[in-house]
From Swiss-Prot:
One Gene Ontology biological process: ribosomal small subunit biogenesis
One annotated GO molecular function: structural constituent of ribosome
UniProt source species: Wolbachia pipientis subsp. Culex pipiens (strain wPip)
Gene symbol of the encoding locus: rpsD
Short name of any one Pfam family annotated for the protein: Ribosomal_S4
Protein name per its UniProtKB record: Small ribosomal subunit protein uS4
Length: 204
């Protein structure tokens, strides 16, 4: 897990933003790309380069593959309504996203780890698939046997993030109710995710 977390901070530096809003992210002090020539700064990007960079923000923020991200966008595009909000709603309904934004875990990676180790239930049934789509009214809960896991204790002590309005979190019970699909403006991103550029990227 330490290796994964260190790698994610390199991702932040490569993108030039504090993607997860963490105080210890190295991009806060070194606002240039990693590597031998990183100190030379960022190159000026073409329109496609900007779109591609925005796509990478979402890919890394949600810790999913390019294939999964593209599939999510295509599903959102086919639905009625504003494509960007459909896209965000689909990403935020992932079980790993709900758990991460509950504030019970410090990172999206730790959320995925808890889920894969069968420490998480949805409506009292164990679900070990991070991409599971949570529905409005569903209750996500961390099982009691996992309550003493260090990353949960750390997150509770630091309280770096509060649950957004579309989630109803109970820190004592380690449970969170998914109320509704959010719009882009409601998600507590710590960086400008430029969702409009992602729409352009997949609409080429």
């Amino acid at each position: 897990m330490t290796t994964v977390i260190n790698r994610k901070y390199r991702i932040s530096r490569r993108l030039g933003v504090n993607l997860w809003g963490r105080a210890k992210d190295s991009v806060n002090k070194r606002k240039y790309p990693p590597g031998q020539h990183g100190i030379l700064g960022f190159k000026k990007l073409s329109d496609f380069g900007k779109q591609f960079a925005a796509h990478k923000k979402f890919k890394f923020y949600y810790a999913i593959s390019s294939k999964q991200l593209r599939r999510t966008f295509l599903d959102a595009y086919k639905r009625k309504g504003y494509t960007a909000d459909n896209f965000i709603g689909a990403l935020e309904s992932r079980l790993s996203s709900v758990l991460y934004h509950s504030g019970f875990v410090p990172t999206i990676y730790s959320a995925k780890q808890l889920i894969s180790h069968k420490h998480v239930t949805v409506n009292d049934k164990v679900v070990n698939i991070s991409s599971y789509r949570v529905k409005p009214g569903d209750i996500v809960k961390i099982r009691e046997r996992a309550a003493k896991i260090p990353i949960l204790i750390e997150a509770e002590q630091k309280q770096e993030r509060k649950a957004p309005d579309y989630l109803e979190a109970d820190s004592k019970a380690l449970s969170v109710k998914y109320l509704r699909a959010p719009q882009y403006s409601e998600v507590p991103y710590s960086a400008d995710m430029e969702v409009n550029l992602v729409v352009e990227f997949y609409s080429r």
